[in-house]
Amino acid sequence: MLKKNDIVEVEIVDLTHEGAGVAKVDGLVFFVENALPSEKILMRVLKVNKKIGFGKVEEYLVQSPHRNQDLDLAYLRSGIADLGHLAYPEQLKFKTKQVKDSLYKIAGIADVEVAETLGMKNPVKYRNKAQVPVRRVNGILETGFFRKNSHDLMPLEDFFIQDPVIDEVVVALRDLLRRYDLKPYDEKEQAGLIRNLVVRRGHYSGQIMVILVTTRPKIFRVEQLIEQLIKQFPEIVSVMQNINDQNTNAIFGKEWRTLYGQDYITDQMLGNDYQIAGPAFYQVNTEMAENLYQTAIDFAALKSDDVVIDAYSGIGTIGLSVAKHVKEVYGVEVIAEAVENSKKNAQLNNISNAHYVCDTAENAMKNWLKEGIQPTVILVDPPRKGLTESFIKASSQTGADRIAYISCNVATMARDIKLYRELGYELKKVQPVDLFPQTHHVECVVLLQRRKG
């Protein structure tokens, strides 16, 4: 029986959905970070349970031809790029397999073609938003990323998958915080001022927003700090402060203040302009989000007399992208600020046939049914937990012909597809899209169509 610190030779036979290597020894399944299929390694046992164990690589005996040898291991240890050690074409194959496996294991579907995952030409430096913790490391204020499964900060300047201008802004901010002797947050002591730095940059506009997340309102000499920062980066149009005094892992608290400029940046998506506020959800990979949304629009095969429901509508990016091609759009979003953003964004783009309400998706769906609104197409883009059963049932009762489902969690997507099939819909098309290159995450668009007769 293997025990902690034993070293054993193993072959990696698979990857978990999170990108860890899988090895089988003495009837146990071991999970090993930074190990790829076909690799033979000496594995040190870290932990053993009744059926599973965890190990780490002591030595590579045979390495995979698909290993990316150039990756800085800091990106693996932090989880920034937990699939970065796998060559990009193989990452795309891995993601296609994740979708196929979920559809088969959860929904029992094996007879629908899953298209190859749509990837990026340049799969690095793509993130338009950074959320960076600020902590003291070896007596110095540092910015970086937490080690995987911990709150130990690893100082980093180049985040590999972020817009390089954002990385430059973070480093400049770090240096200014040091210069003005502003204290980093200390989780254990519940002390210090600066918790996190959040930076957004418009992919097309180049506009930059900086958010200082602090434990209390007063920031000593913040005006001088902002003045120095804007000298370096004149593209900054917004500096916000968010106050979070709670003992929590949540980035933002409830109180927001505008320290400089406006409280939003503007950027484009599929030809429309969008105002993006500090707390607003906006896809972090603009290039691939456009591919994702365009795929959903193409799948829906929209016509000028279509009535479209846009559930989980965010700031209106999907619904407003289709509004000019259809009769009406009805959007629902549970976050009030996002609904206000949607309405402003409709005005910004001279769109008058898009209507937004603040409610849960299932409540709004039921209310629209009562009001006699009969959608022909439903677009859904739910959070990771997927759709609720009540929403699926209510949306099925509308008689909508087509449902385009955008998913950020293929397991919950497969679960939801299973119920839709029971309620009279067929799965017609499946297209995975790589919004998060170098990570194990995969987005997917599927088309569900109502069965005839």
Q: How does the language model describe each region?
A:
Residues 61-69, 73-184, 204:
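Extended interfacial segments that mediate partner engagement and assembly in macromolecular machines
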Residues 153-195, 216-240:
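Internal alpha/beta scaffold segment
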Residues 2-9, 17, 217, 221-453:
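Rossmann-like S-adenosyl-L-methionine
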Residues 198-202, 208-218:
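Carbohydrate-binding surface patches
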Residues 21-26, 144-148, 211-213, 342:
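Short, acidic/hydrophobic/Gly-rich beta-strand patch recurrent on exposed beta strands
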Residues 115-122, 187, 196, 432-435:
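Short, solvent-exposed loop/turn elements at beta->coil junctions and helix N-caps
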Residues 1-74, 107, 355:
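Terminal RNA-binding accessory module
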